[in-house]
Amino acid sequence: MKAVLIPGDGIGPEISASVESITKAMNLDIEWVKYRAGAEYAKETGEVWEPGLVDAIEEYKWALKGPTATPIGTGFRSVNVALRQKFSTYANVRPLRNFKGIDSKYENIDLVIIRENTEDLYKGIEYMLTDDIANGVKLITREASTRICRY
Protein backbone atom coordinates (compact mmCIF):
# COMPACT_ATOMS: atom_id res chain seq x y z
CA MET A 1 0.00 0.00 0.00
CA LYS A 2 1.28 3.47 -0.84
CA ALA A 3 1.01 6.36 1.60
CA VAL A 4 2.26 9.93 1.54
CA LEU A 5 4.95 10.89 4.06
CA ILE A 6 5.63 14.59 4.63
CA PRO A 7 8.78 14.83 6.79
CA GLY A 8 8.29 18.57 7.45
CA ASP A 9 10.66 20.87 9.32
CA GLY A 10 12.78 20.84 12.49
CA ILE A 11 12.55 17.41 14.12
CA GLY A 12 10.07 16.26 11.46
CA PRO A 13 12.60 14.43 9.25
CA GLU A 14 14.01 12.56 12.27
CA ILE A 15 10.52 11.53 13.42
CA SER A 16 9.61 10.48 9.88
CA ALA A 17 12.74 8.34 9.58
CA SER A 18 11.75 6.61 12.84
CA VAL A 19 8.25 5.97 11.48
CA GLU A 20 9.78 4.38 8.39
CA SER A 21 12.04 2.17 10.53
CA ILE A 22 9.19 1.12 12.83
CA THR A 23 6.79 0.26 10.01
CA LYS A 24 9.54 -1.70 8.27
CA ALA A 25 10.40 -3.60 11.50
CA MET A 26 6.71 -4.44 11.91
CA ASN A 27 6.63 -5.81 8.35
CA LEU A 28 3.81 -3.46 7.44
CA ASP A 29 3.15 -3.30 3.73
CA ILE A 30 3.56 0.47 3.39
CA GLU A 31 5.47 2.14 0.59
CA TRP A 32 6.10 5.67 1.80
CA VAL A 33 6.00 8.25 -0.99
CA LYS A 34 7.77 11.36 0.29
CA TYR A 35 6.82 14.94 -0.46
CA ARG A 36 8.41 18.07 0.94
CA ALA A 37 6.37 20.84 2.55
CA GLY A 38 6.84 23.53 5.16
CA ALA A 39 9.02 26.53 5.92
CA GLU A 40 12.31 25.03 4.75
CA TYR A 41 10.78 23.99 1.43
CA ALA A 42 9.12 27.41 1.03
CA LYS A 43 12.42 29.18 1.73
CA GLU A 44 14.12 27.15 -1.02
CA THR A 45 11.34 27.26 -3.62
CA GLY A 46 8.79 29.93 -2.73
CA GLU A 47 6.07 27.26 -2.68
CA VAL A 48 4.21 25.86 0.34
CA TRP A 49 4.55 22.24 -0.76
CA GLU A 50 6.04 20.12 -3.47
CA PRO A 51 4.03 19.79 -6.70
CA GLY A 52 1.96 16.61 -6.77
CA LEU A 53 1.42 16.42 -3.00
CA VAL A 54 -2.34 17.03 -3.05
CA ASP A 55 -2.85 14.65 -5.99
CA ALA A 56 -0.86 11.94 -4.19
CA ILE A 57 -2.94 12.29 -1.02
CA GLU A 58 -6.12 12.09 -3.09
CA GLU A 59 -4.82 8.99 -4.89
CA TYR A 60 -3.39 7.08 -1.90
CA LYS A 61 -6.16 8.22 0.50
CA TRP A 62 -3.94 8.91 3.48
CA ALA A 63 -0.84 10.77 4.59
CA LEU A 64 1.36 11.17 7.63
CA LYS A 65 2.80 14.64 8.21
CA GLY A 66 5.67 15.58 10.47
CA PRO A 67 5.82 18.96 12.20
CA THR A 68 5.94 21.93 9.83
CA ALA A 69 6.92 25.51 10.63
CA THR A 70 5.14 28.66 9.49
CA PRO A 71 7.34 31.75 9.24
CA ILE A 72 5.69 34.80 10.80
CA GLY A 73 5.08 37.85 8.64
CA THR A 74 5.99 36.31 5.28
CA GLY A 75 2.55 35.68 3.81
CA PHE A 76 3.39 31.97 3.85
CA ARG A 77 0.28 29.90 4.47
CA SER A 78 0.40 27.24 7.17
CA VAL A 79 0.77 23.76 5.67
CA ASN A 80 -1.34 22.39 8.53
CA VAL A 81 -4.26 24.74 7.95
CA ALA A 82 -4.06 24.50 4.15
CA LEU A 83 -4.21 20.68 4.24
CA ARG A 84 -7.01 20.68 6.83
CA GLN A 85 -9.09 22.99 4.68
CA LYS A 86 -8.28 21.20 1.42
CA PHE A 87 -9.27 17.78 2.77
CA SER A 88 -11.86 19.02 5.28
CA THR A 89 -10.18 17.27 8.21
CA TYR A 90 -12.33 19.26 10.55
CA ALA A 91 -12.16 17.19 13.76
CA ASN A 92 -9.12 17.53 16.02
CA VAL A 93 -9.51 14.60 18.43
CA ARG A 94 -7.40 14.69 21.61
CA PRO A 95 -7.82 11.74 24.02
CA LEU A 96 -6.61 12.19 27.60
CA ARG A 97 -6.09 9.21 29.91
CA ASN A 98 -4.13 8.17 32.95
CA PHE A 99 -1.59 5.41 32.48
CA LYS A 100 -0.97 2.73 35.10
CA GLY A 101 2.36 3.16 36.83
CA ILE A 102 2.64 6.87 36.07
CA ASP A 103 1.91 9.23 38.95
CA SER A 104 -0.58 11.99 38.27
CA LYS A 105 -2.15 14.79 40.27
CA TYR A 106 -5.57 13.49 39.14
CA GLU A 107 -6.83 9.91 38.96
CA ASN A 108 -9.22 8.12 36.62
CA ILE A 109 -8.96 10.60 33.77
CA ASP A 110 -10.63 9.33 30.60
CA LEU A 111 -11.60 12.30 28.47
CA VAL A 112 -11.75 13.10 24.77
CA ILE A 113 -11.61 16.70 23.58
CA ILE A 114 -12.92 17.34 20.07
CA ARG A 115 -12.14 20.68 18.47
CA GLU A 116 -13.31 22.12 15.16
CA ASN A 117 -10.20 22.42 13.05
CA THR A 118 -11.01 24.46 9.91
CA GLU A 119 -12.83 27.62 11.02
CA ASP A 120 -12.42 30.24 13.75
CA LEU A 121 -8.98 31.84 13.44
CA TYR A 122 -7.90 28.95 11.19
CA LYS A 123 -9.78 30.70 8.34
CA GLY A 124 -6.96 33.25 8.28
CA ILE A 125 -9.19 36.29 7.83
CA GLU A 126 -6.76 38.91 9.09
CA TYR A 127 -5.86 42.44 8.11
CA MET A 128 -4.20 45.57 9.43
CA LEU A 129 -6.52 48.39 10.53
CA THR A 130 -3.55 50.72 11.02
CA ASP A 131 0.20 50.23 11.29
CA ASP A 132 -0.35 49.47 14.98
CA ILE A 133 -3.64 47.54 14.99
CA ALA A 134 -4.33 44.12 13.50
CA ASN A 135 -7.73 42.45 13.27
CA GLY A 136 -8.43 38.71 13.13
CA VAL A 137 -11.96 37.50 12.39
CA LYS A 138 -13.13 34.38 14.25
CA LEU A 139 -15.51 33.08 11.58
CA ILE A 140 -17.74 30.28 12.88
CA THR A 141 -20.59 28.95 10.73
CA ARG A 142 -23.67 27.00 11.73
CA GLU A 143 -22.69 24.30 9.20
CA ALA A 144 -19.25 23.70 10.73
CA SER A 145 -20.61 23.90 14.27
CA THR A 146 -23.30 21.33 13.49
CA ARG A 147 -20.81 19.08 11.72
CA ILE A 148 -18.40 18.99 14.69
CA CYS A 149 -21.26 18.45 17.15
CA ARG A 150 -22.46 15.46 15.14
CA TYR A 151 -18.94 14.04 14.93
Predicted features and spans:
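N-terminal phosphate-binding or glycine-rich loops at protein starts, especially the Walker A/P-loop
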Residues: 1-36
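Anion-binding alpha/beta catalytic cores of soluble intermediary-metabolism enzymes, centered on
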Residues: 1-10, 39-151
